[in-house]
């Protein structure tokens, strides 16, 4: 529903427009969490799609992200103090759960990190620390 119009001429142009709307580096500290949801609403409005974007604090050890993904909704995951990404925002697209014999399970979230061409990387879903996320619902 409307997803074919999300691309702004090219992937590069779309990325650059989000970079502007999120005011990345405008405050000399990267992108502030508070600017991400507004950027989604502004971008979608520019391409003629009405949406409601919302910033959520804490992922409840990743379970809230898994719940969104299970309902077929991509999530903008905001990571802090990650061993590889440090403080970086990525698009969460799916997840895998590994079950252990008698020890529960671990969840890994599939992401598009903007550093590689394909969304084929995973981060541990327990989201160590205070990771936040943004959801976007089309109206």
Which stretches of residues belong to each language-model region?
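Short linear motifs at secondary-structure transitions and domain/linker junctions
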Residues: 50-54, 64-69
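Active-site signature of cysteine proteases
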Residues: 62-64, 70-71, 76-139
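Extracytoplasmic/secreted proteins, especially bacterial periplasmic and envelope-associated proteins
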Residues: 31, 35-42, 60, 64, ...
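Cysteine-nucleophile protease catalytic domains, especially the papain-like/related folds used
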Residues: 1-55
């Amino acid at each position: 529903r409307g997803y074919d119009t999300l691309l702004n001429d090219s992937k590069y142009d779309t990325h650059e427009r989000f970079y502007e709307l999120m005011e990345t580096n405008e405050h000399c500290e990267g992108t502030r969490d508070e600017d991400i949801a507004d950027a989604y609403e502004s971008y979608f409005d520019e391409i003629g799609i009405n949406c409601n974007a919302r910033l959520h604090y804490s992922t409840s050890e990743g379970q809230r992200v898994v719940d969104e993904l299970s309902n077929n909704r991509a999530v903008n995951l905001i990571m802090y103090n990650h061993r590889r990404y440090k403080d970086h925002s990525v698009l969460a697209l799916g997840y895998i759960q590994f079950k252990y014999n008698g020890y529960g399970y671990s969840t890994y979230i599939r992401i598009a990190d903007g550093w590689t061409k394909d969304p084929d990387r995973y981060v541990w879903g327990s989201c160590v620390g205070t990771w936040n996320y943004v959801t976007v619902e089309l109206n």
